[in-house]
């Protein structure tokens, strides 16, 4: 957008109860962006565009998922928001107020013990989906 050639990903804000999600998301997102030859990743003060992401909520069967969601096979839901700002003009070029990704039983992914859940398997898949969803929205919109 706006003939921008570069992008910076600001530190991701994590408002979920699960530490480490922001680090994993940052790695996934930067990996996707680095694989795109049409955009160059630069520090915030040098990039044309700044991407801000906030993880708002991680819902699991033990915390946050409704009985209806659980009964229909939902295993985990991650919600967040993002906005893209043009540093040169100081305006928001794009905003996504609710990014929502989920994992369901039908996908063959099981979350057995949520109290010992680590950043592996299921949660990584949720983060991968969030990063891909965000990436697709940025590059599909423009």
Predicted regions and their residues:
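Second-shell loop/turn segments in exported
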Residues: 11-18, 113-123
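Surface-exposed short loop/turn segments
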Residues: 36-39, 46, 50-121, 132
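A structural "domain/chain start" motif
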Residues: 1-31, 35-46, 88, 127, ...
């Amino acid at each position: 957008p706006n003939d921008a050639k570069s992008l910076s990903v600001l530190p991701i804000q994590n408002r979920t109860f699960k530490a480490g999600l922001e680090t994993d998301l940052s790695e996934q997102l930067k990996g996707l962006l680095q694989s795109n030859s049409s955009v160059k990743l630069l520090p915030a003060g040098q990039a044309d565009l700044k991407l801000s992401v906030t993880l708002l909520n991680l819902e699991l069967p033990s915390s946050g998922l409704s009985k209806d969601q659980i009964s229909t096979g939902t295993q985990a839901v991650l919600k967040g928001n993002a906005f893209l700002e043009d540093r040169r003009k100081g305006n928001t070029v794009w905003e996504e107020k609710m990014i929502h990704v989920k994992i369901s039983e039908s996908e063959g992914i099981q979350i057995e013990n949520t109290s010992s859940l680590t950043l592996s398997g299921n949660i990584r898949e949720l983060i991968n989906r969030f990063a891909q969803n965000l990436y697709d929205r940025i590059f599909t919109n423009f």
